[in-house]
Amino acid sequence: MLGQKLNARKREIKNRGYLNQLKRSEQVPAVIYGKGEEAVPIILEKRELNRIFNVHGSRGLFSLEIEGESKPMMTLIREIQRNPVSGQLIHLDFLSVNLNEKINSNVGVLLGGEEEVMKKGGILQAGLKEVEVLCFPQDLPEYLSADISSLEIGETLHVADLIVPAGVEILTEAESVIASILAPSKATTGEEEGAEAAGEGEEAEEKPE
């Protein structure tokens, strides 16, 4: 099956009280948007969403099985709203897609090998956390990965160094910085040395003459 299956029902657009009632009943309101199409308000079960997200994440294709519709709708999640305190899902925006048309989308960058950098005494300075790509919906990767373990202090990883799967084109400038490896700052080193000297002075004062 292409895309993770999600069950949904169409809903009427009502007042905020109705939306609050949905949330209390463990249902999540959502809207499906599409190019040249009217927005479709739907509701989904929070439990099913949490299960799918925990196992597969929220990126990639989702096949929406809408009650009363004969065919599933292929979609991507464009926005997830969560309660800032509890972290619970409160609203989703879906984008309907045509599997025969390429789409622009942002994809996260996953860095590996930071422990090796730290062993060398380097400090990771992260750059872009995501890049823009162009591909068919079914080829959209969950993330793009990069191994920084071989980088030395003073070296930089660029967008051009990312591992890109077949069928995916990166639109972000190739020279944009993904990560830089820095040396510990002299200022920090100086502060540490000063603290050590102060500690030695205190110990000297405590010793009896």
From Swiss-Prot:
It comes from the Bacteria. Residues 185-209 are annotated as: Disordered. Keywords: Ribonucleoprotein, Ribosomal protein, RNA-binding, rRNA-binding. Pfam families: Ribosomal_L25p, Ribosomal_TL5_C. GO terms for molecular function: 5S rRNA binding; structural constituent of ribosome. Belongs to the bacterial ribosomal protein bL25 family. CTC subfamily. This is one of the proteins that binds to the 5S RNA in the ribosome where it forms part of the central protuberance. This is Large ribosomal subunit protein bL25. It comes from Syntrophomonas wolfei subsp. wolfei (strain DSM 2245B / Goettingen). The gene is rplY.
